[in-house]
């Protein structure tokens, strides 16, 4: 799927070592309806320093409207912003 790069609201948890884990996120679709997505499991977390912009990418197994989905979220450290990069399935 092509990159969406949609800004999202995220509730995340940080452990004692500072590692973040998204718990749920909310986004607005093209019809301006809000959707809340419950993250069941973070399958992968990787750090990237592309062109000097430090970011974390999270591959999340989640549930939206009773259906299981796979999403990729991005957290940009410098701006403290979250984005929904893509919905994989």
Where are these regions (language model features)?
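Cysteine-centric segments in proteins
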Residues: 1-89
């Amino acid at each position: 799927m092509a990159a969406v790069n949609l800004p999202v609201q995220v509730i995340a948890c940080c452990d004692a070592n500072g590692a973040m884990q998204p718990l749920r996120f909310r986004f607005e679709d093209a019809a301006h309806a809000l959707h809340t997505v419950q993250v069941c499991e973070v399958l992968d977390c990787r750090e990237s320093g592309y062109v000097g912009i430090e970011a974390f990418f999270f591959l999340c197994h989640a549930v939206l409207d009773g259906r299981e989905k796979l999403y990729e979220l991005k957290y940009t450290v410098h701006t403290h912003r979250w984005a929904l990069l893509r919905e994989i399935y």
